[in-house]
Curated annotation (Swiss-Prot):
Subunit structure: Interacts with the terminase subunits TRM1 and TRM2. Interacts with portal protein.
Gene: TRM3
UniProt cross-references to HAMAP family, sorted A to Z: HSV_TRM3
Enzyme Commission number(s) of this protein: 3.1.-.-
EC primary class: hydrolase
GO cellular component annotations of the record: host cell nucleus
Function in brief: Component of the molecular motor that translocates viral genomic DNA in empty capsid during DNA packaging. Forms a tripartite terminase complex together with TRM1 and TRM2 in the host cytoplasm. Once the complex reaches the host nucleus, it interacts with the capsid portal vertex. This portal forms a ring in which genomic DNA is translocated into the capsid. TRM3 carries an RNase H-like nuclease activity that plays an important role for the cleavage of concatemeric viral DNA into unit length genomes.
GO biological process terms, semicolon-separated: chromosome organization
Active-site residues annotated for this sequence: E326 (for atpase activity), D481 (for nuclease activity), E555 (for nuclease activity), D667 (for nuclease activity)
Keyword set includes DNA-binding: yes
Pfam families membership: DNA_pack_C, DNA_pack_N
Residue window of motif Walker A motif: 226-233
Organism: Epstein-Barr virus (strain GD1) (HHV-4)
Subcellular location: Host nucleus
Protein name (database record): Tripartite terminase subunit 3
Amino acid sequence: MLYASQRGRLTENLRNALQQDSTTQGCLGAETPSIMYTGAKPDRWAHPLVGTIHASNLYCPMLRAYCRHYGPRPVFVASDESLPMFGASPALHTPVQVQMCLLPELRDTLQRLLPPPNLEDSEALTEFKTSVSSARAILEDPNFLEMREFVTSLASFLSGQYKHKPARLEAFQKQVVLHSFYFLISIKSLEITDTMFDIFQSAFGLEEMTLEKLHIFKQKASVFLIPRRHGKTWIVVAIISLILSNLSNVQIGYVAHQKHVASAVFTEIIDTLTKSFDSKRVEVNKETSTITFRHSGKISSTVMCATCFNKNSIRGQTFHLLFVDEANFIKKEALPAILGFMLQKDAKIIFISSVNSADQATSFLYKLKDAQERLLNVVSYVCQEHRQDFDMQDSMVSCPCFRLHIPSYITMDSNIRATTNLFLDGAFSTELMGDTSSLSQGSLSRTVRDDAINQLELCRVDTLNPRVAGRLASSLYVYVDPAYTNNTSASGTGIAAVTHDRADPNRVIVLGLEHFFLKDLTGDAALQIATCVVALVSSIVTLHPHLEEVKVAVEGNSSQDSAVAIASIIGESCPLPCAFVHTKDKTSSLQWPMYLLTNEKSKAFERLIYAVNTASLSASQVTVSNTIQLSFDPVLYLISQIRAIKPIPLRDGTYTYTGKQRNLSDDVLVALVMAHFLATTQKHTFKKVH
């Protein structure tokens, strides 16, 4: 039995012995290169293990792989057999009884192709010796030695030397380790970050990962959505304990959603440090919930454990790593204090949480799926393609295209699924499996019900039937939301034409929809848009001869002059008498045929949402569209935008609405919203232009 206080001295003795006996460390001690390329200086590259070679070899994966397998490896205190516990590739060992040799023909050919190095080029020789010195200096760098100690301690931790029980990291746990470890490298070793990234690749089994992808670990924030009981808090405790004990001058923060969780983590970190390391170096301050680990001759490392209920406890602190446990349940009042660390140059926030589908407010992290940087990491047992199959088969517990890997401490089968869903429908998918597809489809607080959308799609009105046409009003309401661009990836001109029931103005029928883009940016944009409106009205009037007048609103928020021009052209060319919504000029008594959209938009959206959910909005069986693709049903085109409606809360407690998607604008939806608003409110005054 050995005291923990003696561990450091024994570790140093073992490391020295390994370095003396190592057969690979001598490679960096070579004074003469194996290859000496004597070309121009810009064309050569000094490699510390090979010599001076052509610079094109910098991009040679074979050389990189050869040096990684046969070159010197960082000497870890634990044996290399323990490294595969968290994904490392084992070192290549050649059996003693096997004598490796080259075939004579191959040897002679290589000797002709590779003449003895020419050591007369003193400049190239100096470059080689400089590269060797630089490589040695990195292996002796204090930060490198600390990082090596962290990897060594992690291997020992997983092999059971601390907890007396071997463990193996899950994929997401390894990711949390990598995000923490590589970020600390990037802030503690700025000048040699890429070199150290490369050195530690083999320890984590990342040989095939490019340096560009490794830079993902330098992100200022990372988010992990993990199912319940998968070891989220366990790995955070291990990471914090090992960082404190092996790395100097590191400040860590831990924020939990409940006080008892923070207290449990605080106690577990103390227990790990005092039992596995020198307890005399551990200082605990229970009043401030801080733990300090003193490093001889270096700056101490600390961790503070706080809760979101004391939102000011972390203000004024400096953290290099801030772990936010169960982040989906953190009080929103505490988020500004947490997100403030994003401004700190050498700080990283790691959000770790389970998935919760009970409330939109506690599932906000999934919104980061659209972030420009790949911040979101989700563990799920079902993919998007098989989501519907999963719902239809009660016996399925995972996606058929996945190779199911369930941690040993998790029970997941059809009986568990059935029992869990009896308590709360859908709980198995979200809480236990990490399924976030329901979040992406807006099922948390669905704005428009699925059955209402299905009715809008399937139950269309036969407006060509004389009996139905006799019940419809004689007025056609048209709303024009013009856009003066020919970029089909941006917003286009949205046009919607509706009418209503003669007896019930709240019952609205959609007769026409247009999504129009300018062919080119010329001076006749107003003419093109107006022509599109006139063509739509002409088609509708041809099918519905009972219509007697057209009431139009041309939005003028983008360009008032163009809106007036559009209204004038429509008034002159329309086959029916036209009346327009007018806006009074503030500086004079003049009224212009345009509509300025203000705060009525939110009310109009709410009115349309109510209409869809109550089936008071319908579409005609002959809904007209001259611009939406012939292969695409205009009503389905509209429904795709209705499904995307989402409310956005404002500071004053009200909401604004949008239907914009990544690959589709909401121009047609906005036009329909406002056309429906004009037809149902009956409060706007329409006047003729001439």
